[in-house]
């Protein structure tokens, strides 16, 4: 039986997600499984392809299936996962997680249109050393319809996840869950400065992670830079 004290491995969480997705978790079981999510939220319905869900056809998308093996197995640093954390009144923060180290960057976002998103992302990515600028994986949100402009500006290729496949950005999804401790649902995210977002990112980057043998993301990233 699943109880409020039950803990799951990352693999088990993926399996639970599959049960939700396939409609196999109902009634009491669904409530119990929901309690296991760090944010205590119901199943996140993956964004569909309809424009009303913030999705639409993106020209010249490159599929995640074409992403290099070095990104898939996390062997080489510089491959990022990205998403938007959503708050009240259609406010957003860009969340970026480096796959090798789980290092997190947060980007203040005044608006969600693709011009604003691409410009904000490019500004932060260009500050990184060249070896940390290899690829970016995103879902099929229309905010990244300007991905070609982003690639030209940063020389970072964007790969798009399959529809309804949040586990293809698993590190980013997990980090967004951690961030809800600081930015609960219903929070107006526009009131936070970039300086404050940097402080929160630093807290996450200095937190030991089991998946890194209890090393911190900050330390892991420093190792690859020296």
Where are each of the predicted segments found?
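Active-site beta-loop-alpha junctions of metal-dependent nucleic acid enzymes
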Residues: 86-89, 106-130
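Short conserved beta-strand segments at catalytic cores or DNA/RNA-binding microdomains
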Residues: 72, 85-105
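Short, amphipathic alpha-helical "recognition" segments used to contact nucleic acids or chromatin
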Residues: 8-25
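Basic, flexible linker segments flanking DNA-binding modules
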Residues: 31-72
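Charged alpha-helix within mobile-element recombinases
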Residues: 126, 141, 148-226
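Mobile genetic element proteins and their domesticated derivatives, centered on retroelements
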Residues: 16, 83, 96, 102, ...
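Two-metal-ion RNase H-like nuclease active-site motif
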Residues: 77-86
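Acidic/histidine-rich, metal-coordinating catalytic segments
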Residues: 130-144
């Amino acid at each position: 039986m699943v109880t409020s004290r039950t803990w799951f491995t990352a693999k088990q969480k993926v399996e639970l997600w599959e049960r939700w997705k396939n409609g196999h978790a109902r009634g009491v079981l669904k409530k119990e499984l929901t309690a296991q999510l760090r944010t205590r939220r119901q199943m996140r319905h993956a964004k569909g392809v309809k424009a009303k869900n913030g999705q639409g056809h993106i020209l010249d998308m490159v599929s995640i299936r074409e992403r290099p093996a070095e990104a898939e197995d996390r062997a080489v640093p510089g491959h990022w996962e990205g998403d938007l954390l959503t708050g009240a009144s259609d406010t957003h923060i860009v969340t970026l997680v480096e796959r090798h180290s789980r290092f997190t960057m947060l980007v203040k976002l005044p608006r969600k249109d693709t011009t604003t998103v691409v410009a904000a992302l490019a500004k932060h990515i260009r500050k990184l050393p060249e070896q940390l600028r290899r690829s970016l994986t995103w879902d099929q949100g229309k905010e990244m319809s300007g991905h070609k402009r982003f690639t030209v500006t940063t020389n970072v290729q964007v790969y798009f996840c399959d529809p309804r496949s949040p586990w293809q950005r698993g590190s980013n999804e997990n980090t967004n869950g951690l961030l809800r401790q600081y930015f609960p649902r219903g929070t107006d995210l526009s009131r936070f400065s970039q300086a404050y977002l940097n402080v929160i990112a630093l807290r996450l980057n200095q937190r030991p992670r089991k998946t890194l043998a209890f090393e911190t993301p900050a330390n892991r990233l420093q190792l690859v830079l020296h």
